[in-house]
Amino acid sequence: MTIYRVDENGEASVKPIVTTFDFAELMNVHPVDLEELEQDFMTLDQEPVDVIHHFYPGIYMREARLPKGCFLIGHKQAKPHLNLMLNGYVGFLGGGEAKGPFMAVGEPGRKCGVIREETAWYNIYATDETDIGTLESMFLEKSDAAIAQEIELAQAETDETVAARADYLSMLLDLDVTHEMVSAMSAYKDDRINLPWGAYKFRSAPSPIHGNGVFASARIEAGETIGPANINGKRTVLGYGINHSANPNAYAVATHGGISVVAKRDITGNRAGVFGEEITMDYRQSRKVALCLR
């Protein structure tokens, strides 16, 4: 997904190829030009788009909260599925529009257009799968530009990622454990379980800190429960997938029969197709909580 803000005249600066796009021009772009257009738009600041993942028996719903006044290029849908617009108003590329409430079967292809009013859009798929990466490989066909962007972000080296890895080594000494022990614990699969049915604001993806991590897909407020990490001794992705940080944005809390992860501060979510902040914890703190349950 690529999304950027336009002004009241439907114009936005796009660099380096052109300086402005008129709304009428945008709505008449030929589909074969979309990938080039998408690459141009990736040079712009992307708008926040909360993506919330809903899991229920036999159903995965991908909710996107689309801000008014933006032009959106969605990922290509690989299969027919149910579309639900709970509220909002979208004008589509090439003509046509949808006003909520609206429901229809979405055919394979890309949806592009201007968000005329704040919109809640749901893609609904028939599946029992709960891993977002697997779900995306099943139902989405991302462009080369989108894939390249994800790889670049996963390999980004920042002061924060360097500090996280350095403090990880200090944490090993503090807890008197080895990297091999921590890696083996994270990789152990016999105690893994799926998340309970419900709605979640995160996903797992390759991390610039280490291996795979957990990233916010929607804005999470300080004090908000992100989800369960441990349920009666069984671990969810929050229990085995969160990376350590010297400056964590989340912490572990003991609950009746398990452990939950709570936001320590506000955590930013997706900006269009760009993942939000990586959710991190201090393993020293989470270890203390785990030991208290024994």
Would you name each region that the model predicts?
Residues 57-78, 108:
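Conserved short histidine dyad/triad with adjacent acidic residue
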Residues 116-160:
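Double-stranded beta-helix
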Residues 67-69, 101-102, 107-110, 116-118, ...:
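Tight coil/turn sites that cap or link beta-strands
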Residues 1-63:
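A short, N-terminal "cap"/entry segment at the start of jelly-roll beta-barrel domains
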Residues 63, 89-112:
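Short acidic-glycine-tyrosine-enriched beta hairpin
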Residues 74, 93, 104-107, 228, ...:
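A generic structural signal for residues embedded in beta-strands
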Residues 153-294:
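Conserved catalytic SET/PR domain of SAM-dependent protein methyltransferases, capturing the structural core
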Residues 77-94:
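Glycine- and acidic-residue-biased ligand/ion/polar-headgroup-sensing regions
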